[in-house]
């Protein structure tokens, strides 16, 4: 009952604010080319399907449900139809999920590391994103980005990545919207209570960036996207720091963080 009261009060506050707030498209506005140097495009013969984040010369972080056959990774992309001079293409040398490459799952432990077949050269449009030093606090304003649809439920895929600011919300808000999350501690709940800003179809695997660090990985949410009291669900990267660092260091017998999901 207490949670219902909190949700009701928050909704009233947001509705009062909405009278003066302009409408926004899903995904916000076109990203500045300088702000998504770590963002990578995942595609195969079927076309683009996910994003990911470059975290060093050899490794990309993305969502486990983005696992596909014959993945190619394109770095340094802005307009998908107009190549940058410093674009680079890599393929996976190794893919690592919490439950093994053959057991990547869409909802639980939605995180995957891709080791690239050769080292990436940093350049004007290519640079890594830092891993988190601390978890984000509720209320933090963070930025999500990707080439996902900018309309919903109809889909409109842009040629350039879009960026939008959203907030870290209480996990209980996501649990209220999606009861399947009860007991899962390895997620972040982020968005806007009014639902006017959100990640959406095609943004999967991309970063949620807070203070210059990757704090979340786009995982899933309601559809149509950007609905009232239906925030996005993001993999909480901070909970996987030890796992990520152990994998990149080549340590054996790596244990993924457990949960009760």
From Swiss-Prot:
Expressing tissues: Expressed by the venom gland.
Keywords: Disulfide bond, Glycoprotein, Hemostasis impairing toxin, Hydrolase, Protease, Secreted, Serine protease, Signal, Toxin, Zymogen
Active site residues per record: 65, 110, 204
SS bond list: 31-163, 50-66, 98-256, 142-210, 174-189, 200-225
PROSITE patterns associated with the record: TRYPSIN_DOM, TRYPSIN_HIS, TRYPSIN_SER
Localization of this protein: Secreted
Residues of the propeptide: 21-24
Coiled-coil stretches noted in the UniProt entry, renumbered to this chain: none
Entry-listed glycosylation sites: 103, 117, 121
Domain of life of the source: Eukaryota
Keyword Plastid: no
Leader sequence segment: 1-20
Membrane-spanning segments: none
Keyword Secreted: yes
Entry GO terms, CC: extracellular region; secretory granule
Pfam families attached to this UniProt entry: Trypsin (PF00089)
Domain annotation Peptidase S1: ranges: 25-249
EC number: 3.4.21.-
SUPFAM superfamilies the record matches: Trypsin-like serine proteases
One of the GO biological process terms: proteolysis
Subunit structure: Monomer.
Family, similarity comment: Belongs to the peptidase S1 family. Snake venom subfamily.
Role of this protein: Snake venom serine protease that may act in the hemostasis system of the prey.
PANTHER family assigned to the protein according to its UniProt record, in alphabetical order: KALLIKREIN-1, KALLIKREIN-RELATED
Name this polypeptide is given: Snake venom serine protease
């Amino acid at each position: 009952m207490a949670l219902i009261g909190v949700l009701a009060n928050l909704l009233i506050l947001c509705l009062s604010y909405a009278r003066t707030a302009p409408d926004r498209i899903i995904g916000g506005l076109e990203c500045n080319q300088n702000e998504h140097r770590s963002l990578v495009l995942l595609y195969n013969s079927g076309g683009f399907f996910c994003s990911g984040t470059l975290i060093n010369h050899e490794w990309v972080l993305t969502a486990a449900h983005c696992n596909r056959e014959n993945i190619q990774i394109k770095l340094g992309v802005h307009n998908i139809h107009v190549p940058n001079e410093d674009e680079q293409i890599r393929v996976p040398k190794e893919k690592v999920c919490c439950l093994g490459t053959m057991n990547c799952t869409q909802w639980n432990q939605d995180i995957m590391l891709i080791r690239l077949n050769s080292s990436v050269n940093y350049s004007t449009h290519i640079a890594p994103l830092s891993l988190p030093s601390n978890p984000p606090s509720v209320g933090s304003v963070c930025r999500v980005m990707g080439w996902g649809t900018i309309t919903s439920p109809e889909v409109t895929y842009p040629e350039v990545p879009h960026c939008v600011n959203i907030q870290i919300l209480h996990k209980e808000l996501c649990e209220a919207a999606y009861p399947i999350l009860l007991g899962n501690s390895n997620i972040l709940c982020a968005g806007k209570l009014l639902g006017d800003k959100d990640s959406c179809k095609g943004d999967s695997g991309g970063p949620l960036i807070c203070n210059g660090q990757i704090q979340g990985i786009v995982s899933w949410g309601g559809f149509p996207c950007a609905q009232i009291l239906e925030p996005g669900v993001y993999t909480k990267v901070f909970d996987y720091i030890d796992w990520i660092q152990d994998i990149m260091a080549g340590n054996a017998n790596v244990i993924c963080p457990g949960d009760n999901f």
